[in-house]
Amino acid sequence: MNIVLFGPPGCGKGTQSKRLVAERGWVQLSTGDMLRHARAAGTELGRRVAAIMDGGNLVSDAIVIELIEERLPEAKAAGGAIFDGFPRTVAQAQALDQLLLDRGTQVDSVIELKVNDEELVQRLVKRAEEEGRPDDTEDVIRKRLEVYYGQTAPLIPFFAQQGKVKAVDGMGSMDEVAAGIAAALEEK
């Protein structure tokens, strides 16, 4: 099964992805983690990624799709993938559909985690302090939310036309959100 965890920065995609990996054995394909790893590696690609992320902007489709494509064989072997932070644009969604179709599979479900903006900012500022994430200043967080609503939120209609979107309240405890996701995945 291939699922997309969808929602604004700080809604809990990473936390819930890790939980699904532990419970179901699927592979987490977190573009945020992959991009932070590339950044930390200090390669030419990592330096380009750092400059883009530090400005609160989206990394190019070509870079992100290349990172995802490299991990698809691992996901197939595990029986499924959780796409966390990908796709972020309609072009990326179309590319993902094609990548999966070429491998005889598809996105089975899109879980939209719903959290209000002020809660998102509070969560991200706290995470930045706890984890030392230089890309999570309050100004950059607000810019990331603007980018999300302008460029990524329009994906909801793209996947809704395919009948794949299931909204889950992301404002509860981690366990409550996990229960909401589990219920959504059982829906047909």
Swiss-Prot record:
Origin organism is Maricaulis maris (strain MCS10)
Keywords (A to Z) from UniProt: ATP-binding, Cytoplasm, Kinase, Nucleotide biosynthesis, Nucleotide-binding, Transferase
Q: Where is this region: NMP?
A: 30-59
Q: What is its EC number?
A: 2.7.4.3
> What Pfam families does the record point to?
ADK (PF00406)
Region (LID) location? 126-136
Protein name listed in UniProt: Adenylate kinase
* UniProt subunit comment: Monomer.
